[in-house]
């Protein structure tokens, strides 16, 4: 919204307001500061002692997933291969390195491990096409844009396209909003053609 509809001065004002609000929330919320401190503590425990922590597990999943991707960068290891790869990597390990999962909690890595760079290109092309579809200013455009941006953002820490509820929310959100947008564009195009070719 900021980049599409505001001039430079208003854009700076909006971004400045966001910075002030985020700063105020940071200082007003002890739980936010505590959660952030916990993440850093868990990261330190993972780095120094291979301790099983929430943040440490995610980092370990991502590290191993990048290693799996490097082993098969072009077309990946195949559909459903993630758990088997983690089982093999956990053999003889202790602590967080012994954890086995079927989902690395990152959409890009989940796709990269199974389908390689080809899959990642398709994933990002899909997101880009959907972002471009919702460039207008109607409610349908904004709903569609919100669904896509939310999915892209949360996919940093999860594989929401492949989670049942979140995946269907994306399909329905983009499908319904996209259908409305495309129908409106087709209607406008038809009106333009008719006005250009009077009977």
Language-model segments: residues:
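Hydrophobic transmembrane alpha-helices and their immediate junctions
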Residues: 114-149
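Long extracytoplasmic/lumenal interhelical loops at the membrane interface
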Residues: 48-63, 67-71, 75-115
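Transmembrane alpha-helices of multi-pass inner-membrane enzymes
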Residues: 1, 126, 141-152, 160-194, ...
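Structural signal for the C-terminal ends of transmembrane alpha-helices
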Residues: 1-9, 28-29, 131-137, 175-185
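A membrane-periplasm/extracellular boundary helix in multi-pass inner-membrane enzymes
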Residues: 3-49, 63-71, 79, 84
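Hydrophobic alpha-helical interface/terminus motif in multipass membrane transporters
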Residues: 82, 86, 130-134, 153
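Aromatic-anchored segments of alpha-helical transmembrane domains
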Residues: 20-27, 148-157
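Generic structural signal for conserved hydrophobic packing positions in ordered secondary structure
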Residues: 32, 36, 105-108, 112, ...
